[in-house]
Swiss-Prot record:
This is Serine--tRNA ligase. Its EC number is 6.1.1.11. GO terms for biological process: selenocysteine biosynthetic process; seryl-tRNA aminoacylation. It comes from the Bacteria. Belongs to the class-II aminoacyl-tRNA synthetase family. Type-1 seryl-tRNA synthetase subfamily. Catalyzes the attachment of serine to tRNA(Ser). Is also able to aminoacylate tRNA(Sec) with serine, to form the misacylated tRNA L-seryl-tRNA(Sec), which will be further converted into selenocysteinyl-tRNA(Sec). It is an enzyme of class 6 (ligase). Homodimer. The tRNA molecule binds across the dimer. Keywords: Aminoacyl-tRNA synthetase, ATP-binding, Cytoplasm, Ligase, Nucleotide-binding, Protein biosynthesis. It comes from Lacticaseibacillus paracasei (strain ATCC 334 / BCRC 17002 / CCUG 31169 / CIP 107868 / KCTC 3260 / NRRL B-441). One of its GO terms (molecular function) is transferase activity. HAMAP family: Ser_tRNA_synth_type1.
Length: 427
């Protein structure tokens, strides 16, 4: 959530920043007008309450002195009626201010391409050599089905489209990949967490999914209370410290977790209808950081490095891009996407998004620390995929496919596959 005080102090700057995220200036004007009226009503209410207290004291004295206090009692009733009316207006103003404020995205960082067009995202650099084949490279879904390690047809029978069965060597490969990821993150100082896969509405609000993106999630009820299947481990990891004060000496705090992610993919009809790229349920290893504000840009680079390191050890070519302002996530001030090369598609596809959310999530979730002066400050939060497991499997199948239909297993994964170096039809 944005700092309303900052918007109040720098309204034109705020409008310019948010215009790059498709927010109209009129919305900011409305917010500020409501905020101004709210502050006026607050002052009026406090003045009337003070007056009521004074009159109440006068009435008590007059009654002790057996004086007639009818006029004062009448005046106090009138003041009470005015207070009730102002309290009602104040509640309505609070609701309207909150409604607008919680739906405003984070301010984009200064070095982000300021554009409403995702095509204006900026490529920063590339890594690795794209594989060359003396045959037409196949799509990962064709490879997986022919090897008998991916079964989309039976998954559709059981659950519908955008689901898959991993079988045999495919299941072992998926498990090998995420165990490799977790081990590497542990070496880099991340604490592994196994979090809840169902979270309450306050948690979804804290990380910015609610109220704006309720249509993109799956929700159930438990004893009448709604619980949402997590769209990413970012939600339970960030909310670990919701309404909490972190010891400054512990910062930065680094968490990692493997969880399934559940997404309705609303608005994705017709996109990536085959394969592992866009699923309703998929495994993902997430990285989350909590740090002091002055450290967050350095921590973003560390986050990107930790995601890149996995791709480099897997030998998968990729590039890093800085997303245009309106293509970044709702909570992000800056997002760098890592996109892995997919030979059959002849294009890069996202495999990790690394974001600095500055104090946006911490303000919503009330996550703070005490600075050197003992003053409470909001931490900065960062998150990144490290990595999306299904997309990693897809990229391994495509980049390591062989002419005979088999798939070579990346060297770093072989120990996690009990020494198996390739997946063949017989596996």
């Amino acid at each position: 959530m944005l700092d309303l005080k900052l918007i109040r102090q720098k309204p034109e700057w705020a409008k310019e920043k948010l215009a790059a995220r498709a927010i109209k200036g009129e919305e900011i004007d409305e917010l500020l007008a409501l905020d101004t009226r709210r502050r006026q009503v607050t002052v009026q209410t406090e003045e009337l309450k003070a007056k009521r207290n004074d009159v109440s004291g006068q009435i008590a004295v007059m009654k002790r002195n057996k004086e007639n206090a009818d006029d004062q009692i009448k005046a106090m009733r009138e003041v009470g009626q005015k207070i009730a009316a102002l309290d009602k207006e104040l509640a309505q103003l609070n609701e309207k201010v909150t409604y607008i404020l919680v739906r405003l995205p984070n301010f984009p960082a200064d070095d982000v391409p300021m554009s409403l067009n995702e095509d204006d995202s900026r490529e920063e650099y590339k890594w690795g050599n794209m594989p060359t084949f003396d045959f037409e490279p196949k799509h990962h879904w064709d490879i997986g089905e022919k090897l008998g390690i991916l079964d989309f047809e039976r998954a559709a029978k059981v659950a519908g489209s955008r689901f898959v069965y991993y079988k045999g060597a495919g299941a072992r490969l998926e498990r090998a990949v995420y165990n490799f990821f977790l081990d590497e993150h542990q070496k880099e100082g991340y604490e592994e967490i196994i979090p809840p896969y169902l979270v309450n509405n306050d948690s979804m609000f804290g990380t910015g999914q609610f109220p704006k993106f309720t249509d993109a999630t799956y929700t159930i009820t438990n004893d009448g209370e709604p619980l949402t299947l997590i769209p990413t481990a970012e939600v339970p990891l960030v909310n670990y410290y919701r309404n909490d004060i972190i010891d400054a000496e512990k910062l930065p705090v680094n968490f990692t977790a493997l969880t399934p992610a559940f997404r309705s993919e609303a608005g994705s009809a017709g996109r990536d209808t085959r394969g592992l790229i866009r699923m309703h349920q998929f495994n993902k290893v997430e990285m989350v950081k909590f740090c002091k504000p002055e450290d967050s840009w350095k921590q973003l680079q560390n986050l990107i490095h930790d995601a890149e390191d996995l791709l480099q050890k897997l030998g998968l070519p990729y590039h890093v891009i800085t997303l245009a302002s309106n293509d970044a996530s709702f909570t992000s001030a800056k997002t760098n996407d890592l996109e892995v090369w997919m030979p059959a598609q002849d294009r890069y596809r996202e495999i990790s998004s690394c974001s600095n959310c500055t104090d946006f999530q911490a303000r919503r979730a009330q996550i703070r620390y005490r600075d050197d002066d003992g003053k409470l400050q909001f931490v900065h939060t960062l998150n990144g995929s490290g990595l999306a497991v299904g997309r990693t499997v897809a990229s391994i199948l495509e980049n390591y496919q062989q002419a005979d239909g088999s798939v070579k297993i990346p060297d770093v994964i072989v120990p996690y596959m009990q020494g198996q170096t390739a997946i063949t039809k017989e596996d």
